[in-house]
Each structure stands twice: as structure tokens, then as C-alpha cells.
């Protein structure tokens, strides 16, 4: 259950789109992986099904039950588990080899590695994650 204060604030911000926001919490979670084009130029023969993510050149949806993080190809770095929506910024930025990139929201690093792959390893990608505070529990 989401906190009521949060829901009240979101209802005010989203207006007529608020019901769609709530409905999204009832749908299954969407999970994705991204091929590491610096290590492979073809899709590996995976033991689980995938489907292309329309907005991500090397992005693929997979069934969360597949557990691709346990596969040796993940350990070898042929693909990176990444939230599908997090793949969009690097696609929209359209970086080119030789450019310089600064990623200020780089935790845990998926976008930074995606940008480096799009630059074909040519050009620096500097990354950090700024936090006003961190709480450990």
C-alpha cells in the first residue's frame, strides 16, 4: 500500500491521469536486459524468451521468472540487466564516438555503460551519483 500523503500529492499532480497511475501498480513488473555491444555483435542463444524493446536498440524484455542474472552470459558481461525505462535516456541522447559525456545520475551504472557502448568505447564517459543524504536501515 502506498502512503496516503504520497497518493494525495500524486492525485493533484496527475489530475485525470491518476487512475492510470494506480492501475499500473496492478500490472506485472516489466523487466529488461540490454546486450553489451562492446562484447558481442549478435544476440546470444539464451535459454529463455525475449522480445525487443521498441525504444532501445539493444534492449529486450524478458519474463521475470527467467532469472537471467544467474546465467553465465550475464556473468561474462554479454548483457546487463536494466530497467527498460532507464534505457531511454541514452537512446534519446544519440551520443557519437569521440564525444565526452557526463552522467550525474549513474547509480547503479546502466546508463553510463549503455552510453559507453553507443560511443563504441571511443571517448570518455564520466559518471557520478549525487545524493543529498543517504539513510541506512
Residue ranges: model-predicted function:
Residues 129-137:
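Single conserved hydrophobic/aromatic residue that forms the stacking wall/gate
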Residues 108-120:
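Conserved SAM-binding loop of SAM-dependent methyltransferases across substrates and taxa
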Residues 33, 89, 105:
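Residue-level signal for inorganic ion chemistry
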Residues 99-105:
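Conserved class I S-adenosyl-L-methionine
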Residues 123-126:
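Short beta-strand element of Class I
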Residues 1-59:
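N-terminal auxiliary segments of SAM/dcSAM-dependent transferases
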Amino acid at each position: 500500500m502506498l502512503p496516503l500523503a504520497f497518493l494525495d500529492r500524486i492525485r493533484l499532480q496527475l489530475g485525470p491521469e491518476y487512475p492510470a497511475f494506480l492501475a499500473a501498480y496492478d500490472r506485472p513488473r516489466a523487466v529488461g536486459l540490454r546486450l553489451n555491444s562492446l562484447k558481442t555483435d549478435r544476440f546470444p542463444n539464451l535459454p529463455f524468451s525475449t522480445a525487443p524493446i521498441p525504444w532501445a536498440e539493444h534492449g529486450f524484455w524478458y519474463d521475470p521468472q527467467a532469472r537471467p542474472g544467474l546465467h553465465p552470459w550475464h556473468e561474462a558481461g554479454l548483457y546487463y540487466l536494466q530497467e527498460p525505462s532507464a534505457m531511454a535516456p541514452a537512446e534519446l541522447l544519440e551520443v557519437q564516438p569521440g564525444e565526452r559525456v557526463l552522467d550525474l545520475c549513474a547509480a547503479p551504472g546502466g546508463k553510463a555503460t549503455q552510453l559507453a557502448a553507443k560511443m563504441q568505447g571511443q571517448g570518455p564517459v564520466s559518471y557520478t551519483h549525487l545524493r543529498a543524504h543517504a539513510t541506512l536501515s
